[in-house]
Swiss-Prot record:
Belongs to the reaction center PufL/M/PsbA/D family. Fe cation binds at residues 215, 269. Its EC number is 1.10.3.9. This is Photosystem II D2 protein. SUPFAM superfamilies: Bacterial photosystem II reaction centre, L and M subunits. Its main location: plastid. Pfam families: Photo_RC. The modification Phosphothreonine is found at residue 2. The chain crosses the membrane at residues 41-61, 125-141, 153-166, 208-228, 279-295. It comes from Buxus microphylla (Littleleaf boxwood). The lineage of its organism: Eukaryota, Viridiplantae, Streptophyta, Embryophyta, Tracheophyta.
Length: 353
């Protein structure tokens, strides 16, 4: 008996094949299957943000002005989180809160959930786009894996943290000054700077910046095919097509500087990938911990001694007092519905912390 092995061919393409051919066609802007998620979500997220920062007030949710229409500028405008009373409602336009009324939906903070959810799926779509293109041109998927780090940070800060708290109210609003206020909130209520996961994140981001600067300078320093452009300094031609720097020379240089150096390009570039991605992932895990109100380092012995001995003080105990001041000021301002009334003697007074 003879068995013929071969690929099964269809006489005519079905709808999937037609869609696949159109979506993945080589064009100026690649669409792909991931584009079905990326482009609509990115469009709605950016459109919602521009709409909110231009027209929508935060008076009903935070008692604040937050739009260009009210006099804010690029640094102070924001799309604000919903009120605390709305808890974790998705705030759908057709939901029980807004009941299809667009103006009421904006007043309630519906644009924030709209931007946050479409933004999250837009970022995921961008990562899938990198997977799809890498597969199409037979590359490894490390670009997509690296991009998972900022996605993890976004999801942990904007979605998981408020899900662990009482509502979307405690997430950051989408604006520059709003993010700064959220950072102060994190410090005052969670002592975030003393959290080991934050420390790993800082080490990852700053370490990556250092590696990037060193790597770029080293490659430029060890070019062995000089450019001859009249408008720039020698040995630098940004349009040079081929790779003409000396890894051996770079290795000798850094071996003399540090005593150690990367021996090959693969290990060097993997390390440049590993440092920032690991740092961002660690900080994302730390924010998940804050969602559950896990504490940072507590040096209680220093606090007790500082309370007993007026002459004993450390930078740690000063920071703890500063955090208490942040909490005392922010809690009453940010949560007026709680009717938090602090007696005058516990409120911070200028520098007398």
């Amino acid at each position: 008996m003879t068995i013929a092995l071969g690929r099964f061919t269809k006489d005519e393409n079905d709808l999937f094949d037609i869609m696949d051919d159109w979506l993945r066609r080589d064009r100026f802007v690649f669409v792909g299957w991931s584009g079905l998620l990326l482009f609509p979500c990115a469009y709605f997220a950016l459109g919602g943000w521009f709409t909110g920062t231009t027209f929508v007030t935060s008076w009903y949710t935070h008692g604040l002005a937050s739009s260009y229409l009210e006099g804010c500028n690029f640094l102070t405008a924001a799309v604000s989180t919903p009120a605390n009373s709305l808890a974790h409602s998705l705030l759908l336009l057709w939901g029980p809160e807004a009941q299809g009324d667009f103006t009421r939906w904006c007043q309630l903070g519906g644009l924030w959930t709209f931007v946050a959810l479409h933004g999250a799926f837009g970022l995921i779509g961008f990562m899938l786009r990198q997977f799809e293109l890498a597969r199409s041109v037979q590359l490894r998927p490390y670009n997509a894996i690296a991009f998972s780090a900022p996605i993890a940070v976004f999801v942990s800060v904007f979605l998981i943290y408020p899900l662990g708290q009482s509502g979307w109210f405690f997430a950051p609003s989408f604006g520059v000054a709003a993010i700064f206020r959220f950072i102060l909130f994190f410090q005052g209520f969670h002592n975030w700077t003393l959290n080991p996961f934050h420390m790993m994140g800082v080490a990852g981001v700053l370490g990556a910046a250092l590696l990037c600067a060193i790597h770029g300078a080293t490659v430029e320093n060890t070019l062995f095919e000089d450019g001859d452009g009249a408008n720039t300094f020698r040995a630098f031609n940004p349009t040079q097509a081929e790779e003409t720097y000396s890894m051996v020379t770079a290795n000798r240089f850094w071996s003399q500087i540090f005593g150690v150096a990367f021996s090959n390009k693969r290990w060097l570039h993997f390390f440049m990938l590993f440092v920032p991605v690991t740092g961002l992932w660690m900080s994302a895990l730390g924010v998940v911990g804050l969602a559950l109100n896990l504490r940072a380092y507590d040096f209680v012995s220093q606090e007790i001694r500082a309370a007993e001995d007026p002459e004993f003080e450390t930078f740690y105990t000063k920071n703890i007092l500063l955090n208490e001041g942040i909490r005392a000021w922010m809690a009453a301002q940010d949560q007026p519905h709680e009717n938090l009334i602090f007696p005058e003697e516990v409120l911070p007074r200028g520098n007398a912390l």
